[in-house]
Every structure is written in structure tokens, then in C-alpha cells.
């Protein structure tokens, strides 16, 4: 079923619309206008969600209502072919309110990383439609040649099953395996794995991807999250 849904999503074409939302942080318009220009330079159009630049009374993110409204409005927008969002904190807040039936009715590309992986995993687990770990809006402000190449190759040329190595990556134990890729930011995945919005079938095999940044977590904290993940029954299928 997931592969059938994948086939429905055509590669992006010149003039296609990227919808930008911000479920995890306060978006600053001056910055996002720069990110927007980077996407437009690739021949794409950009649509900001209505409440993208709002913030709540604490100044941390837009309100939950605004973030849910933005995300579901972008889902229902037939013109939008990719939904792009960044990281921060708070993406998991909107997971119970996402219109998963709306996503299944009109499959789009969902692209994010870090805190946004809470949403990527929920979309895949509840719809069977692949979501994509990759660039956030900020990468397009001064996009590197590698990020540009990967984005164009994956989404404008359709080479989503090909990965070209970045020289900064290091392989510790080489090998080959097959399975469905799950995972994401370590603390998010550890805290949400097994909840009702993250149901994983024990009939599938999985490849586990874990993201961490030493700016935000200590080795001790990362070890705690990794051990919590390793004690989940899903690891029998990894």
C-alpha cells in the first residue's frame, strides 16, 4: 500500500508549490523570505501558512490552534505538492490533531528533520505514505551544493532510492540490509515510540535512524534515550 501511495506522488515540476509551516519554532519573516528565495531559485513557488509568523503569549511558537490550523490547511490545499518545516520543540503537540485521512486523500511530500521527525513518523505510521528526512526551510537560505544536489535528485528528478555519499559521513560497520526506515531525533523517538499515534507493524522489518546533536544533548542523555528505544519490542524487527 505504501509503495502504491508513493507512486501517486509525482516528482516536483517547475512552478509547483511548496507549503511552509512551522510547528516547532517561531518563524522570523526576514529569515524565511531568504529561505523562500532559495526555493524559488530552483523554479518552485512558495506558499506560507496563514499563521506562520504568529507566536503565543510566551513567544515560543504560535498557539496550538494556529499550528494545527496551518498544518491541516496545507494538507487540504490541492496546489501544495510538498510540505516543508523545520525543527525546534513542540512538533509532537499537533500529532493528535493532524488530518491523516486528508493526507491519504491527497498524498504530498513531507520533508523535515530534528523535532519535525515526530510528525514524519506519525504520518508514515498512520497513513502508510512515506515521509522524508532531509532539508528544512533554513537549508535553502545559503544552500550547499550537496544539499541542492540531493534535493533536486530526490524530488525534481525522482531518484528517491539513490543516496550519494557526503564525504563527512563515516561508516563504522559496512553492510547491506533492507527494511522500512524509521526513527529520527533521539529524544522524540524515545518518548513517542509505542504511543497510539506511532503504531508499527511487527510484520515488517525496519532500519533504525537516530539523529542527535551534541549542542543539545550530553552523551549520558543520548545513552538514556537509546536504551529506552532498545528496550521497545520494535527492536526485535530492526
Predicted regions and their residues:
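Conserved beta-alpha junction segments in alpha/beta enzyme cores
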Residues: 26-31, 35-38, 177-215
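Conserved anion/nucleotide-ligand pocket segment
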Residues: 130-194
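Structural motif
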Residues: 81-82, 207
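Internal helical hairpin/lid segments
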Residues: 200-238
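N-terminal glycine-rich "phosphate-gripper" loop used for MgATP/nucleotide binding
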Residues: 82-92, 113
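Short, acidic/small-residue loops that bind anionic groups at enzyme active sites
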Residues: 98-122, 130-137
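ATP/NTP phosphate-donor binding region
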Residues: 4-79
